[in-house]
């Protein structure tokens, strides 16, 4: 897929490829006091299932998950999703982290995790690579305030671009086809 795109952004824009060449990588280290705080959150969570890696280091940030990032099955993920909806566990952990570490971006991401990075290093950082004349379209599933797609959706909108809330890759594909068809019609009408 990388070779079919001009540029690919991973890890909230902290890991960037042009073709197969890595052109930018932000190597950020999780501070020890933050790691200890995450370990305590894990220790005191009342959710009973634990699997795999709970603190996943990525370029430019960390993903934290009470359930774990590897070796989890669909049923376990669904159990955590239900638990989180009932208890707002991720929201509460994020709130505590933001209070204790105001120099961190803490955002709810995906179904089971929290994304942590230095303040200002959220997904909106990718806009540094675009011109004001570029037509921007962003697709995301977590666009509410405090979620990991919010900052980019807001920044794209402020630049006159478009953002689309999607449920999954199939929904993304459907919306992409719709945009493609609309652009084709507009070019024929002109």
Protein language model features and the residues they cover:
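Residues at the C-termini of beta-strands that transition into short coil/loop
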Residues: 9-12, 110, 167-170
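Terminal peptide-recognition signature
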Residues: 8, 64, 149
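Hydrophobic, Leu/Ile/Phe/Ala-enriched alpha-helical segments that form helix-helix packing faces
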Residues: 37-46, 89, 93-101, 156, ...
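Active-site phosphate-binding/coordination module
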Residues: 1-54
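Conserved acidic, metal-coordinating active-site core of Asp-based
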Residues: 49-137, 145
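Mg2+-dependent phosphoryl-transfer enzymes with acidic/Ser/Thr/Gly-rich catalytic loops
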Residues: 117-119, 123-190
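Short glycine-/acidic-enriched loop or helix-start segments at secondary-structure transitions
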Residues: 20, 74, 148-150
């Amino acid at each position: 897929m990388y070779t079919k795109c001009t540029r690919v952004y991973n890890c909230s824009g902290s890991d960037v490829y042009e073709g197969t060449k890595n052109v930018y990588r932000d190597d950020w280290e999780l501070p020890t006091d933050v790691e200890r705080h995450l370990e305590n959150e894990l220790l005191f969570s009342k959710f009973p299932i634990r699997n795999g890696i709970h603190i996943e280091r990525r370029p430019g940030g960390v993903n934290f998950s009470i359930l774990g990032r590897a070796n989890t099955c669909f049923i376990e993920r669904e159990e955590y999703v239900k638990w989180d909806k009932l208890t707002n566990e991720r929201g509460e952990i994020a709130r505590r982290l933001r209070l204790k570490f105001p120099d961190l971006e803490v955002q709810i991401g995906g179904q089971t995790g929290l994304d942590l990075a230095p303040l200002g290093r959220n997904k909106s950082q990718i806009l540094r690579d675009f011109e004001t004349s570029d037509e921007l379209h962003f697709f995301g599933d977590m666009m509410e305030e405090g979620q990991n797609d919010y900052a980019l959706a807001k920044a794209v909108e402020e630049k006159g671009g478009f953002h689309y809330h999607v449920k999954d890759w199939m929904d993304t594909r459907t919306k992409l086809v719709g945009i493609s068809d609309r652009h084709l019609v507009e070019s024929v009408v002109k």
